[in-house]
């Protein structure tokens, strides 16, 4: 059975939504959950029928959301340090954390190391499009990149899309300010030339192309990716609020909204980041899923499912093999 270490106390809302997410995941499929935190606080939250799937790793401190990621290595008593250490010692197959994302990334990179051929890891996230989903990377691990980094991101994203998203030939694109090969800054132009070696590379794409369903993997640096991610979260929230405001304007609008209630629910589910769980940190020697600090139990449950799928798919080995084809 898969062993998953969960940073049980690292999110914005404490241990309750995290434990609820673990329990929901266990009710759906069996796995061993290693809860990292204060067992005196955590044990009362576990029902007896699921106790057989739960173990505890004691950790006395939580890495502050206001802390500096560079300090993550200094305190070995934090929940995220101990969770990553379990993975390093191969006592677990994956780590899920809704704590400080910078600390998670720093610890994973420095404690686990990078995959062969990878110079920098990347955070990948799923974005809704009109057909299904688009994988966007990097969304925050690296604000400044070289062309070789973006090329490596492309390979990692392609493998992830093929193995986890089950897309046989994922369409891969590079974010730019125009579709033409000559568009973009020097980084984009140089990266484009490297990515032309990849058979599934379809060229440059603009920001709007994330949502048209014609791209499966979109590559960019962590600065642009994070701006896109946060902007999309804001736009989605604003659109639903505008719809609510308009519905309240008249009785006819309220009737129309009632008739479309089912469609609105489906739309909300498709665009809700909680449905996507977390973001895998690709390129490190292990499986680390970084969840949003504001994750509810549903997001934690889905992040755990991501971790299980990642662990069972042997993605890291496949990434190294794929990169080896180009480095030979």
Curated annotation (Swiss-Prot):
Catalytic activity: a fatty acyl-[ACP] + phosphate = an acyl phosphate + holo-[ACP]
GO cellular component: cytoplasm
Enzyme Commission number, as recorded: 2.3.1.274
Pathway: Lipid metabolism; phospholipid metabolism
Localization, UniProt: Cytoplasm
Ubl conjugation listed as a keyword: no
GO BP terms: fatty acid biosynthetic process; phospholipid biosynthetic process
InterPro entries (UniProt xref): FA_synthesis, Phospholipid_synth_PlsX-like
Keywords assigned: Cytoplasm, Lipid biosynthesis, Lipid metabolism, Phospholipid biosynthesis, Phospholipid metabolism, Transferase
Annotated HAMAP family: PlsX
Subunit relationships: Homodimer. Probably interacts with PlsY.
Family of this protein: Belongs to the PlsX family.
Task performed by this protein: Catalyzes the reversible formation of acyl-phosphate (acyl-PO(4)) from acyl-[acyl-carrier-protein] (acyl-ACP). This enzyme utilizes acyl-ACP as fatty acyl donor, but not acyl-CoA.
Protein name: Phosphate acyltransferase
Organism of this sequence: Campylobacter jejuni (strain RM1221)
Gene giving rise to this polypeptide: plsX
């Amino acid at each position: 059975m898969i062993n998953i270490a969960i940073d049980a106390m690292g999110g914005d809302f404490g241990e309750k939504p995290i434990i609820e997410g673990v329990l929901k995941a266990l009710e759906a499929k069996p796995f061993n959950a290693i809860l990292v935190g204060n067992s005196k606080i955590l044990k009362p939250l576990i029902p007896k029928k699921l106790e057989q799937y739960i173990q505890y790793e004691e950790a006395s401190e939580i890495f502050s959301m206001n802390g500096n990621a560079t300090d993550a290595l200094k305190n070995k008593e934090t929940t995220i340090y101990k969770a990553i250490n379990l993975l390093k010692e191969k006592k677990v197959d994956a780590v899920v954390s809704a704590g400080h994302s910078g600390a998670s990334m720093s610890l994973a990179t420095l404690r686990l190391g990078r995959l062969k051929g990878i110079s920098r890891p990347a955070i990948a996230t799923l974005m809704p499009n009109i057909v299904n989903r688009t994988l966007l990377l990097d969304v925050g691990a690296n604000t400044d990149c070289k062309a070789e980094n973006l090329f490596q991101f492309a390979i990692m994203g392609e493998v992830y899309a093929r193995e986890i998203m089950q897309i046989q030939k994922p369409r891969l694109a590079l974010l730019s300010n125009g579709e033409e090969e000559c568009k973009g800054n020097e980084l984009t132009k140089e990266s484009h030339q490297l990515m032309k070696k990849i058979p599934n590379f379809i060229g440059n794409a603009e920001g709007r192309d994330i949502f048209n369903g014609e791209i499966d993997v979109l590559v960019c640096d962590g600065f642009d990716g994070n701006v896109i991610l946060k902007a999309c979260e804001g736009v989605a929230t604003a659109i639903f609020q505008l719809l609510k405001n308009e519905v309240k304007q008249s009785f006819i609008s309220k009737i129309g909204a009632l008739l479309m209630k089912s469609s609105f629910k489906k739309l909300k589910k498709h665009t809700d980041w909680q449905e996507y769980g977390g973001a895998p940190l690709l390129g490190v020697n292990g499986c680390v899923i970084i969840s949003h600090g504001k994750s509810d139990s549903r997001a934690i449950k889905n992040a755990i499912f991501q971790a299980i799928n990642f662990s069972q798919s042997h993605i890291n080995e496949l990434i190294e093999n794929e990169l080896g084809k180009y480095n030979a």
